[in-house]
Amino acid sequence: MTDWDLSKEDYPNARAVRETIRSFVMELSDECSRSTIEKLAFGTVSLSDPDLELGYKSEDFTRRFLVDDLLDAVNLEYRPQPTADSSNEDHYPDFELSNTVIPVVGEIKPLNNVSAGEDQIRTYLSLSSFDTPYGILTDGMEWRVYGPDRSGSGYAIQNQIRLDNAFQMIAHDRKIISESGLSSIIRQQGVSQITDFVRTFKQEEFDDWTLISLPKPERDQYLPDDYESQSSFEDFQ
């Protein structure tokens, strides 16, 4: 049994994250060779590589078998492809969180190709028609949360979580990665990455830290009167 460094109430979320990655690895095993999965696990090839022939578009595969289920694992609800309120703007993020205090937009890229979406997520955040200071950019392996930078005139990464070591650990457990390809350090880091993912993205924790990170005047725009953790914000001005 994995000794998660989490409160007991968060154990189901951590197990759900681990199971999602395991299921994704098994889906990959139906589409790719073991050597290709090992390269994907260690980031030496992208799922968008033209030499890989999948039954889906690489971005759709990443979303359907990894990103959607990881969001579910941490109790985040979402709606696909929200549209800007202005008819003059034709920009469509891949999803928008719908059960968080702040409605966060998100962009998905194929596994190991997260940087390809950086310009897009910044564009979405610059649109006044999306009422959010935050955006998530992910390829399933790496999760970046963008928010206002210190100058207040742009956007920067506020939080960043990787799941590559967790992917490697689970692929090894499924006998897809060889014994020589995994160290005990990677295994320890894999468990830590799952823990960090839950602590960062579980809905209640996500609400708390995204609110705390905002300046008080902007935070007050989103903070409900009956928010359960409201007293914890008194020291954050």
Regions inferred by a protein language model and the residue ranges of each:
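A short, conserved, highly charged catalytic patch centered on acidic carboxylates
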Residues: M1-Y134, E142-Q237
